[in-house]
Design a protein with these regions (language model features):
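Bacterial N-terminal signal peptides
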Residues: 9-19
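Bacterial N-terminal signal peptides that target proteins for export
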Residues: 1-8
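Surface-exposed, charged secondary-structure patches
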Residues: 96-141
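Short beta-strand edge/turn micro-motifs at domain boundaries
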Residues: 137-154
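Early exported N-terminus immediately downstream of N-terminal targeting peptides
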Residues: 24-102
Length: 154
């Protein structure tokens, strides 16, 4: 459950234009949700869905930043070669884990309900994955990194 929250929390560091305001952050999140929902609702193979979900994640998530954040202070002791190798391995792990978890949702119904500007660089967007008979309701907080207005990321 904790990994799910982390994956979803980081899932929306976006690709928007100009300076990102809170309304733009929630629109970005909703847009990303819609892209993923469209893939998950299509009548295509699981493998193709996974491939498409990985593309969405690569477009919207700062996987490298998440990976180094996960390492904590250990990252300071790594050589440049180790950092490059770690980044490659973490990206592969992240994309595989993320897509395999999401692909089981055939028709996710996610509502964006709130947003909060933390700073000029960060906006939190709150959403709710509505529960069904098969899965519980899940709150999802999206941390949007807006330092680069040309390409905000989760």
């Amino acid at each position: 459950m904790k990994i799910r929250k982390i994956i979803f929390t980081f899932f929306i560091y976006l690709i928007c234009s100009s300076k990102l305001y809170s309304i733009e952050a929630d629109v970005f999140v909703q847009s990303t949700i819609n892209r993923a929902s469209e893939v998950l609702s299509e009548d295509i193979s699981k493998e193709i869905k996974i491939k498409e979900l990985k593309k969405i994640a690569k477009d919207t998530v700062d996987i490298k930043r998440i990976g180094f954040y996960t390492l904590g202070p250990i990252r300071k002791n790594l050589t440049d070669d180790q950092k490059i190798r770690y980044s490659e391995l973490f990206e592969e792990y992240f994309l595989t884990s993320f897509s395999n978890r999401l692909v089981v949702y055939s028709n996710p119904n996610i509502d964006v309900y709130d947003k909060k500007i933390l700073s000029e660089k960060f906006v939190i967007v709150n959403s709710l994955l509505k529960g069904t008979e098969e899965r519980p309701e899940v709150k999802i907080d999206w941390r949007i990194y807006t330092k680069n207005p040309e390409k905000p990321l989760i």
